[in-house]
Every structure is written in C-alpha cells, then in structure tokens.
Amino acid sequence: MKVGMNLFLWTDDPADEAHLPLYARLKDMGFDGIELPIFNPDPEKFAQLGAQLDDLGLERTAITICNPENDPISPDASIRKAASERLERVVDSCEAVGSSLLGGPLYAAIGQFSGAGATEAEW
C-alpha cells in the first residue's frame, strides 16, 4: 500500500515554490506521494513542479473542481465552452506535473443547484 497526503490542507497553489520544503518534509515523514489541487492550471508551472517532485521521489495525483464561471452543465454555451477549455488546461497541467490520476467532481460546478427536481430523462 502507498500513502499520500492531500496538499489542500496547506495550499490551493501547490506550484508555488515556497511549498518545496513541505514536500521534502512529507517525503521524509514516509509519504509516497502527494495529491495536488489544480485550481489554477498552468502547464509550464506544473512541469517545473513535476521535475522538483521527481527529485524528491514523490508520486503525484491531482484534484480539481469546476466553479460557476466554468460549469460544464451550465445552460449558457459560453460557460460550457469555458469549462471545456479550463478542463483541458487542467489535464495538460496533470500531464506536465506527472500526475497518474485526476479526481473531481468534474461534472458540475460546486454549489450550483438548479432548484428543480430531476426530469423524467434524468430519472
């Protein structure tokens, strides 16, 4: 079994180099990997972080969420398009950092509710 630590306990910007000492400490404590919150996708920054995590010997997975500005199930086509574009950047950031897994929820924005019950097609 492998044991990892979710970095959301400390930060929502894991690519910030100020957190490198924390990552080294987690490795020294015996953690096999870390789970990265990717809320501000930036493949270039995450590629740099990936190289640093390789040097530390830490494996990585990632998580993200959608918000109202990039809700994949919004009735507004421009918001759905923004969701698609953002999720592409998240996936690119995962690839750049060397993440083996991306978790969500990815299907809808956090905290967005229509207030309507399920339709017959949804039920």
Where are these regions (language model features)?
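Acidic-and-aromatic substrate-binding clefts and catalytic sites of carbohydrate-active enzymes
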Residues: 11-17, 36-48, 71-73, 110-114
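A short, structure-level motif marking secondary-structure boundaries and short turns
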Residues: 6-8, 33-35, 74-76, 119-120
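Acidic (Asp/Glu)-rich catalytic clusters
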Residues: 21-28, 43-64, 89-99
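Hydrophobic faces of well-ordered beta-strands that scaffold small-molecule active sites
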Residues: 3-7, 32-36, 60-65, 102-104
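Active-site acidic/histidine proton-transfer and metal-coordination neighborhood
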Residues: 77-123
